[in-house]
A protein has these predicted regions:
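Aromatic-anchored helix/helix-loop segment that forms the rim or "lid"
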Residues: 66-75, 109-134
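Conserved small/polar residues in nucleotide/adenosyl-binding loops
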Residues: 205-207
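Aromatic/acidic polysaccharide-binding cleft in carbohydrate-active enzymes
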Residues: 90-119, 137-175
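Active-site-proximal helices and loops of the catalytic beta/alpha 8
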Residues: 1-87, 139, 156-187
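Acidic/polar loop patches that form or flank catalytic/metal-binding clefts of enzymes
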Residues: 19-20, 147-151, 191-199
Length: 208
């Protein structure tokens, strides 16, 4: 299917791109006993970047610097650079908890929908979550790839899993500070081609 799709899409022009929803490392993904050739076999141009998402969350929430380095560099070392430069970098999707809830809320674990429906962040949790979200968005915008925002994240929307992560956009009740912060990140991101096409090196700093 993907071979046929790629051929049809590319027939419309080389500037047409194909993204795939792959939750793991797409360079060595194996399913149904078959190793997939998503990024090296003329199928996908790039993918949704779930590994970066988890690396960012674990770093911002738990301070896991080594895990962050490993998660990011593994992808960058495994993917062709054109695919890495096009990675869809997000912090929330319709399949996962809202980033604000993930950063500052209780772990959803195996809780059912009734439990999730009744849970909202306290004012203290919400404020703490916003501070972590800003840190996460800095990484989202300036790691290799393309920053992609799940509607409402920039406005401070919270929520657990589907359907609570799909609440309506909070028109008139947006967190204006977060929206302004997001706009500033976008301006900085567009200010230099290095953020879109440059090389990246991570350095671990030990503070005693």
């Amino acid at each position: 299917f993907l071979d046929t799709l790629n051929k049809a899409v590319k027939a419309k022009g080389d500037d047409k791109v194909i993204y795939g929803e792959v939750w793991e490392d797409a360079s060595n993904k194996e399913s149904y006993g078959v190793r997939r050739r998503y990024l090296i076999g003329g199928q996908l141009d790039s993918v949704m970047n779930y590994p970066f998402k988890e690396a960012i969350i674990n770093y911002c929430k738990y301070g896991d610097a080594r895990g962050f380095e490993a998660g990011v560099m593994t992808i960058l070392e495994h993917y062709p650079k054109p695919s890495a430069d096009m990675l869809m970098n997000f912090l929330s999707t319709h399949d996962t908890e809202r980033i604000l809830t993930r950063l500052a809320g209780e772990d959803v674990g195996c809780h059912d929908r009734e439990w999730q429906a009744e849970r909202y962040l306290s004012p203290e949790q919400y404020a703490y979550g916003l501070s972590l979200l800003k840190c996460a968005m800095v990484l989202q915008f300036f790691l290799p790839g393309v920053p992609c925002i799940y509607y409402g994240d920039e406005a401070g929307l919270e929520g657990y899993k589907d359907p609570f992560n799909r609440r309506c956009y909070p028109w008139g009740k947006e967190n204006l500070d977060m929206i302004d912060f997001t706009k500033q990140l976008a301006v900085i991101r567009k200010s230099s081609k290095a953020f879109a096409q440059g090389e990246m090196k991570l350095s671990l700093i030990h503070i005693s």
